[in-house]
């Protein structure tokens, strides 16, 4: 008997599973706010050099004659953001005047920013423009570095300490570091706290998904995994609305961080995974948790009959194979695990590269940043509805593979779209982003189902590490556009297509298949599958031989 049979006996997808899933997915939704927050808090508005200290700058009419005399214009007729005339050139106000040969200099006295849309951002506060413009991207890279470190750290800790402890700590760390970020007075301190915030991303996402999957019967796992994607989509829509209402970056930062204190407080009620407790010799606590589940699901009588012996019998065959400690090498220890791990490394990396390459720089589309953020969030809804349907009725492997290949083709096709068709290019990019978001959430669930319970968190943590590496590489690939504009879209699209092909060729289907508890059980399942296929193949060969022999005998 499998552990999922016990969950079915205690109510299946009952009230406990619904409440538990909702309480875990709500924080996951707000994580999207932090991931894409710098689209708003680090937005770079139009700007130009501040005038010399001995020059009196009018307080109104920033596009008036004084600006034409003090700031050179670029090829589009806009003020140069990083240069100014050494001396005001009033002669340029005359018709047909030329600025050729006029001496210019850098912005020695700072910058003037257009505050009509953003009253304050970190770019304005610390002048992250011109020579310092790379620091803006550095801050986001540091956040993604934190996500990378968190994936490596929390994945291993969760398999050793349980799912709940790292999750509770991550809520607290994000609440504190997020609020502290809103009060820092220097860019270096801002980066430190952004790093700490990034670490919690993996701690929350990975442990929330594992808890949902491990408390959910087989028939409810697909919908639960897709709901995680919808929560992330909801978070992007919330960010667009909150950022539109709260424009100052410090208040916006605080607004999306404070709710995690509430999540920290109620997370103490969340029970630990009984699967993990049983596999680590804590059967009594597992029984207590299961009895609470039974009571909440209206199966109090069934819960009272539970004992440690009864509960342990559901995974008794697995206890003999459980290792008391695990290491990263366990992800490569056996052929079946090694095949899954190597394939997922490429899939997570490729998905992340393409996803963040599209979603982390909304200003490049030339439309309202709030509108683009909302569009990039809304597009996930129909995409995930399709993903939900195909995952339930077709399977995980076909769904993930199809979305990755489709997204890659759309990203490549986008580079052939004329640049003056900004709206059409944005819509096409949004469709590609929707496919990538759907494949992302599908592969989260797929990965959790592919790995056995004893190393599930470590496997998901390691896979997430590869995704974070992709997030770090994405900005570097974007810079290849300075060499050739076709390199970034080709790189993003090609990696996505290759990842989709790898899923189709090397991973097995997990739809309606009970979760595997140990590495040994996974190896047995793979061997049994091969034996069954070999038997079927031999039967077909014998049948074909007999079919071919009959006419020959009749002829003779």
From Swiss-Prot:
TM helices/strands, residue ranges: 16-36, 138-158, 167-187, 195-215, 226-246, 251-271, 340-360, 367-387, 398-418, 426-446, 458-478, 486-506
Protein name: Solute carrier family 22 member 20
Region (Disordered): 526-556
Biased composition (Basic and acidic residues): 526-541
Glycosylation-annotated residues: 39, 54, 61, 96
Gene Ontology cellular component annotations, sorted alphabetically: membrane
GO molecular function, one term: organic anion transmembrane transporter activity
Keywords: Glycoprotein, Ion transport, Membrane, Transmembrane, Transmembrane helix, Transport
GO BP annotations, alphabetical order: monoatomic ion transport; organic anion transport
């Amino acid at each position: 008997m499998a552990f999922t049979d016990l969950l079915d006996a205690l109510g299946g997808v009952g009230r406990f599973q619904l409440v538990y899933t909702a309480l875990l997915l709500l924080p996951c939704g707000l994580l999207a706010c932090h991931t894409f927050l710098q689209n708003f808090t680090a937005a770079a508005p139009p700007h130009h050099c501040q005038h010399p200290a001995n020059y009196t700058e009018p307080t109104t009419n920033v596009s008036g004659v004084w600006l034409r005399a003090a700031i050179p214009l670029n090829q589009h007729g806009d003020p140069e953001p990083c240069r100014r005339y050494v001396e005001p050139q009033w002669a340029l106000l005359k018709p047909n005047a030329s600025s050729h040969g006029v001496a210019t200099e850098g912005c020695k006295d700072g910058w003037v920013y257009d505050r009509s849309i953003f009253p304050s951002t970190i770019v304005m506060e610390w002048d992250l423009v011109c020579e310092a413009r790379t620091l803006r991207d550095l801050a986001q890279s540091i956040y993604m570095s934190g996500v990378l470190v968190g994936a490596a750290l929390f994945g291993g800790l969760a398999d050793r300490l349980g799912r709940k402890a790292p999750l509770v700590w991550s809520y607290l760390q994000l609440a504190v570091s997020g609020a502290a970020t809103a009060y820092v007075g220097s860019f270096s301190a801002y980066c430190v706290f952004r790093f700490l915030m990034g670490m919690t991303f993996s701690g929350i996402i990975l442990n929330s998904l594992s808890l949902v999957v491990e408390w959910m019967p087989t028939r409810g796992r697909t919908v639960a995994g897709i709901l995680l994607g919808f929560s992330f989509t909801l978070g992007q829509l919330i960010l667009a609305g909150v950022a539109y209402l709260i424009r100052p970056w410090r208040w916006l930062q605080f607004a999306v961080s404070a709710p995690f204190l509430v999540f920290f407080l109620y997370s103490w009620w969340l029970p630990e995974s009984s699967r993990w407790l049983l596999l680590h010799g804590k059967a009594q606590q597992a029984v207590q948790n299961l009895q609470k589940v039974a009571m909440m699901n209206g199966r109090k009588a069934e819960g009272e009959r539970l004992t440690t012996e009864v509960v342990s019998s559901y995974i008794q065959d697995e206890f003999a194979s459980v290792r008391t400690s695990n290491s990263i090498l366990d992800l490569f220890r056996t052929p079946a695990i090694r095949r899954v791990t190597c394939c997922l490394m490429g899939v997570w990396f490729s998905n992340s590269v393409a996803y963040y390459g599209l979603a982390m720089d909304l200003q490049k589309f030339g439309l309202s940043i709030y509108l683009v953020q909302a569009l990039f969030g809304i597009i996930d809804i129909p995409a995930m509805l399709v993903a939900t349907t195909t995952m339930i009725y077709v399977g995980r492997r076909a769904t993930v593979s199809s979305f990755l290949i489709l997204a890659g083709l759309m990203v490549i096709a986008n580079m052939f779209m004329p640049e003056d068709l900004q709206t059409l290019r944005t819509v096409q990019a949004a469709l590609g982003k929707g496919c990538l978001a759907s494949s992302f959430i599908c592969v989260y669930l797929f990965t959790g189902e592919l790995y056995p319970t004893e190393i599930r968190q470590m496997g998901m943590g390691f896979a997430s590490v590869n995704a974070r590496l992709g997030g770090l590489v994405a900005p570097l690939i974007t810079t290849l556009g300075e060499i050739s504009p076709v390199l970034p879209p080709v790189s993003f699209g090609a990696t996505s297509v290759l990842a989709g092909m790898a899923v189709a060729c090397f991973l097995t289907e997990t739809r309606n298949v009970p979760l595997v508890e140990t590495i040994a059980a996974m190896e047995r399942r793979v061997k049994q599958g091969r034996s069954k296929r070999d038997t079927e193949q031999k039967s077909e060969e014998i049948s074909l031989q007999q079919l071919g022999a009959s006419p020959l005998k009749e002829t003779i």
